[in-house]
């Protein structure tokens, strides 16, 4: 099978529980062998650059990184190749909605997270990221853009919040990256658009690409490439959208590694 590019989601796909220490040494070895065969490997994640680089280095990845769910594409040195950002008019309306509904909101600018208050939501979030944090009244946040806007709360709260956002703001991309994270991005910011950018840059057909992911924000990417695999630990309603042969094993059971062994190495 002629696979030329492989795209990995990070959390709960190649990592367990957002823990960098759970990277499989067997997967590291396989990635090296794939690269020796001329296959290029990329990460496609909701993470920012500073939280993605340690994973890329551990895996030996030297090619483009798709960050912030496709809002930004960089080379491995952090040089920006593509960005699609949330403009001021949109993020100011999101701030209003956050205050009206009393739902926690993160804004992102240059690998720094901005919040209005330090609460349990951001305490938990910061335990999983290497990004910087600034606590500031959002009335004083006057940057020209936010890379993305992230609401954190219970699933049912975010379900209702999504409806309210969609009723008031158009031309945006809204996606769940976890059951408790609702992300609002530029309408062109999507992992699949990051994948398309990389494939077009090198003249690679989508049928020569493979991808792995576990959440709603991975769906379009997995359906676009010729070889897209949803993880066995994904929620059932998402797995139901894929043929059985497009479901990889659970991340705790080396699901990515086993599927690579099967599809690329014929093991």
What are these regions (language model features)?
Residues 1-5, 24, 183-267:
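Mg2+-dependent phosphoryl-transfer enzymes with acidic/Ser/Thr/Gly-rich catalytic loops
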Residues 4-19:
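Asp-based phosphoryl-transfer active-site loop
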Residues 24-121:
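Active-site phosphate-binding/coordination module
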Residues 34, 69, 149, 222, ...:
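Residue-level signal for inorganic ion chemistry
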Residues 38-42, 62-63, 148, 207-209, ...:
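Short active-site oxyanion
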Residues 60-62, 82-85, 122-126, 191-193, ...:
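Short, hinge-like loop/turn segments at secondary-structure boundaries
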